Amino acid sequence: MTASPSLLERFQALDRFLSEHQALWRPRPFVCRSLPWENDYPELAAWLRARSLANAEAAHNQPGELAAPAPFPELAAIACELSQIDELPASEPPAVAHRQNLDIPGRKSLQIQAFGARLHFRETPRHWLDWCSGKGHLGRHLARNGAALTCLEWDEALVNAGDQLSERLGVDATHRCQDVLASDAGDQLHATHTPVALHACGDLHVRLLQLAVAKQCRQLAVAPCCYNRITDEQYVPLSQTAGASSLQLTRDDLGLPLSETVTAGARERRNRDQSMAWRLGFDTLQRRLRQQDEYLPTPSLPGAWLKKDFADYCHDLATLKQLPAPGDEDWPALERAGWQRLAEVRNLELVRGLFRRPLELWLLLDRALLLEEQGYRVRLGTFCPSQLTPRNLLLLAELGSPAQNVTRPE
């Protein structure tokens, strides 16, 4: 493996790219009927708007491969270069007893095994701490060779279910009901623990990093998820380096890395598309009803709403938002307009898609730099293919070594 750039150099390159081009990735096509950058790149905008919904879906997960007008190819090449990161080395997958996989969905089981295979530390962990553990599936997998295990979870039903599973499987585990954001959460963490978090959201994994540093945990492993699940409207950088950046991120901005979807089934995709097309059709209607050409946020709606006809959907949503009642509308035309806008939105979002991974790496490096500033040696890389989960980045940290490494292809 060739020597990799330092964490700082990687962060600075990503920061320059994201800052310079933020006018391309910050505006959201779903909210804005026209995007500011369309005036600068009319050929690209017209080309994208003329494409079908199926075209957009085909390019969604690999937007960089799209042969689009300038400046798309140049941006795609830079984004691809900045996003290069290799998988972390894996140990031979252990033979996992069928009983150990009790109650674990297949995809989650594979994620757990891939995550566990990458946890190489100088010191053999003696006590695993499964953060936001759910039923403790990850912790039990890691502690199968006899290490101690503590599982922290706020949902009492999951705590009880996990405790029963551990007892049934003969795993010596302590399952505790704990709100990890509460002021007493630090009492559960000790320097001898090896904390692990597989897809802990936003504030939850940030809290773990902060407490692990405060408690001087010797080593830890975190695969972040849902960076936008934070309390504050504005993102508060964790490291001194990110704090000095001119890039000021909102909670909405943090949702960009999560827009990649590879695990949804056909039915889920159909429902998602219908929901978005109907919302966009309603958006056209509400602008007319309010006589204001601006987006109106609407709440998440139960799936039963999609079983209404479109006219009833719009009437009921207008009532919910306390808007004037719709009059005589051409409902089929309005619904068609919603589907047409969805095709345009999805294709315009391909520009934002070029910045998904760079922004995710910027956020991951902010976390890594925080740990490096506190004396940790940090390794970053993927732990599984993106087809298994798009959130496949893993941060490994060990206290007391000056070296750092971002795993990149040779």
Stretches with model-predicted labels:
Residues 2-39, 181, 187-410:
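Class I S-adenosyl-L-methionine
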Residues 38-120:
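Conserved Class I S-adenosyl-L-methionine-dependent methyltransferase catalytic core
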Residues 125-134:
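Conserved class I S-adenosyl-L-methionine
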Residues 135-146:
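Conserved SAM-binding loop of SAM-dependent methyltransferases across substrates and taxa
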Residues 148-153:
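Conserved SAM-binding motif I beta-strand of class I
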Residues 162-163:
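Conserved SAM-binding loop
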Residues 170-180:
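Conserved SAM-binding strand-loop segment of SAM-dependent methyltransferases
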